[in-house]
């Protein structure tokens, strides 16, 4: 198994300064929206089965960019899976509700998604495996309010979730 960590060049440089690349891991500097890294991976592993995990990124892209990225992944990684987290519309459209990581920062959430099946309409080669709700993971972390919210899945989806797709 090979792990590839992709991030912006300045983040990869900082990561290399702080954490040397572990054996079997590889850092790739550049934009997630570029296609060269996808083509390089496919060329290097023509028979590879890929699980692509995109964490904490897509909500900062516009919906058009997310759609384009997912189409490009489907073009190149048939048979694999793609997993990513999304903010729901309640968080994406609110000026007042922000994840803790954004408080005090100017970064903006630019897209949100409530129903994971919507992505299947954007890109028919993606088949929803799961739409997992964060409030169901690590209940102690969320406290009483989070556990209570976890009893109402529709509200949770308006906040955030983790989506997984099989690439056909």
Please give the residue ranges for each predicted region.
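Alpha-helical subdomain
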Residues: 6-168
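Short, small-residue-biased leader/transition segments that mark boundaries at the very start
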Residues: 1-3
């Amino acid at each position: 198994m090979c792990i590839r960590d992709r991030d912006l060049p300045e983040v990869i440089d900082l990561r290399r300064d702080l954490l040397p690349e572990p054996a079997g891991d590889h850092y790739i500097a550049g934009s997630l929206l570029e296609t060269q890294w996808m083509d390089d991976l496919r060329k290097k592993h023509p028979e590879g089965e890929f699980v692509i995990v995109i964490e904490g990124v897509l909500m900062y892209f516009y919906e058009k960019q997310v759609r384009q990225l997912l189409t490009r992944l489907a073009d190149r990684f048939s048979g694999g899976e793609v997993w990513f987290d999304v903010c729901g519309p309640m968080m994406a459209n609110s000026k007042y509700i922000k994840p803790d990581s954004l408080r005090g920062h100017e970064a903006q959430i630019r897209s949100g998604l409530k129903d994971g099946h919507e992505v299947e309409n954007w890109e028919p080669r993606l088949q929803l495996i799961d739409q997992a709700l964060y409030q169901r993971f690590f209940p102690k972390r969320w406290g009483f309010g989070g556990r209570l919210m976890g009893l109402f899945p529709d509200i949770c989806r308006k906040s955030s979730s983790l989506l997984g797709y099989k690439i056909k």
